[in-house]
Design a protein with these regions (language model features):
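Hydrophobic alpha-helical transmembrane bundles of multi-pass membrane proteins
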Residues: 1-137
């Protein structure tokens, strides 16, 4: 951080990473566990997996000192979420009734709106990671 914006803004930006990362994992166990279990898993996962990896990779951690470069969460967000989702999907097994009871998409317009929001949001993640809106972002 270069000091051009308040520390609270940086904290809120980092919280967006912490919030979205467990949401990436949820797709691996959708329709197989209860919502309360998802909330409990998300909190525990943030403490046990996400925070230690952030500490080691970002902000001058020992992996950063060893030369690991993680721009916009490639390791901290995507690798940890992907490995966790794969592990959970393997542990939970197949969904019951899938693929016999497929439901067609109900609103292509809403799908496009969601894709647009995701696109703009991820651009914000990249710009925020560079702490600038320039060619680095």
């Amino acid at each position: 951080m270069n000091g051009d914006f308040p520390e609270s803004v940086w904290i809120m930006f980092q919280m967006t990473f912490a919030i979205i990362t467990p949401a990436l994992i949820v797709g691996a166990f959708v329709e197989r566990i209860k919502f309360t279990a998802v909330m409990l898993f998300s909190g525990l996962w943030l403490i046990v997996v996400y925070c230690p990896v952030c500490y080691r990779v970002w902000g001058g951690g020992w992996l950063a000192e060893a030369g690991v470069i993680d721009f916009a969460g490639g390791i901290v967000v995507h690798a940890t979420a992907g490995a966790s989702a794969l592990t959970l999907a393997w542990m939970l097994g197949r969904r019951s009734g899938f693929p016999r009871n497929l439901k067609p998409p109900h609103s292509p317009g809403m799908v496009m709106m969601g894709a647009g929001m995701l696109w703009v949001g991820w651009f914000g993640f990249n710009a925020g990671s560079a702490a600038a809106a320039n060619g680095d972002a």
